[in-house]
């Protein structure tokens, strides 16, 4: 567990597709017209989305980026010739909280004064890589999720603001004992439960100390399992929301997935709700690839968590 004394969220910028903009988020910074964003390929569209976020945030001392493309290809291209130190994280959908932990360590140790976490995913890119190309027309199962299209950049520094990152726990890799890549919520549910228990133990806190537990992309299926596991342990959170489960309106599948679900819902739905003063962000990740699934391996999962506290009268 890592404790932070002076790590604050100062600004954020997002670029989303119309599907996310028409969902349960409010006032994203920029909405693209279609999946191609006036580019020839969707890969280049995602690169452009990342670039738009970076262009609308202060120049950082370091960038930590994560996405779902092979070898972090989209952020690698975005960072070309910027002359900014760059750290790529490839931890599936668990990366947002992990990026905040990494930046928090650097800022608190005075290695840097500030940095940006840039998270992105693109529905057409991820579906092609992990499932089937959209053109194939494969039907969506009710337990399945679909990747959100979004890039979101978050600028952190040691300059005080209303939102403080106070601590974080890096998760352990657990075996889900499931082989179904369409049931990522089921794959990740126990991981979310285990990391939450570890975090409560490490911080010597109770589940009732938190106004909200926000998980990343368990979806409706995984969120139900997660709460059942907590209840079996005698734990009843004040409030639990899964970002993937609520991101879209009238969604017939289990919801949205991808590393952007958590920050998108947090910054554009949750953060201005005055009921929530102390929030746990659990970034959930299914650590599979096509080879693993084709070879019928059970899918590992990991969850990373950070605590965000709202500082009243911080001025």
Residue ranges, per PLM feature:
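A generic, well-ordered mixed alpha/beta core segment in the N-terminal half of proteins
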Residues: 77-79, 85-144
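Phosphate/pyrophosphate-binding betaalpha-module
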Residues: 142-151, 155
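Conserved "HGTGT" condensation-loop signature of ketosynthase/thiolase-family condensing enzymes
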Residues: 1-87, 152-315
């Amino acid at each position: 567990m890592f404790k932070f004394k002076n790590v604050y969220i100062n600004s954020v910028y997002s670029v989303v597709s119309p599907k996310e903009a028409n969902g349960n988020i409010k006032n994203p910074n920029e909405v693209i017209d279609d999946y191609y964003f006036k580019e020839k390929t969707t890969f280049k569209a995602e690169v452009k989305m990342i670039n738009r976020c970076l262009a609308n945030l202060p120049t950082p001392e370091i960038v930590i980026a994560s996405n779902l493309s092979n070898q972090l290809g989209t952020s690698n291209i975005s960072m070309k010739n910027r002359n900014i130190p760059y750290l790529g994280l490839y931890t599936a959908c668990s990366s947002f909280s992990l990026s905040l932990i990494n930046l928090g360590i650097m800022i608190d140790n005075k290695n840097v004064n500030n940095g940006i976490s840039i998270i992105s995913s693109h529905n057409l890119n991820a579906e092609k890589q992990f499932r089937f190309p959209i053109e194939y027309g494969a039907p969506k199962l009710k337990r399945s999720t679909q990747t959100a299209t979004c890039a979101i950049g978050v600028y952190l520094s040691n300059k005080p603001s209303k939102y403080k990152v106070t601590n974080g726990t890096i998760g352990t890799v657990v075996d889900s004992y499931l082989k179904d890549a369409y049931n990522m919520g089921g794959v990740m549910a126990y991981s979310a439960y285990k990391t939450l228990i570890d975090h409560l133990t490490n911080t010597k806190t109770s589940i009732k100390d938190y106004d909200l537990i926000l998980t990343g992309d368990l979806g409706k299926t995984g969120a139900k399992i997660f709460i059942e596991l907590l209840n079996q342990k005698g734990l009843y959170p004040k409030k639990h929301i899964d970002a993937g489960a609520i991101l879209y309106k009238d969604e017939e599948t289990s919801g949205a997935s991808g590393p952007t679900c958590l920050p998108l819902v947090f910054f554009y739905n949750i953060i201005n709700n005055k009921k929530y003063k102390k929030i746990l962000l659990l970034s959930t990740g299914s650590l599979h690839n096509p080879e693993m699934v084709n070879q019928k391996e059970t899918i590992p999962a990991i969850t990373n968590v950070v605590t965000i506290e709202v500082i009243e009268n911080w001025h």
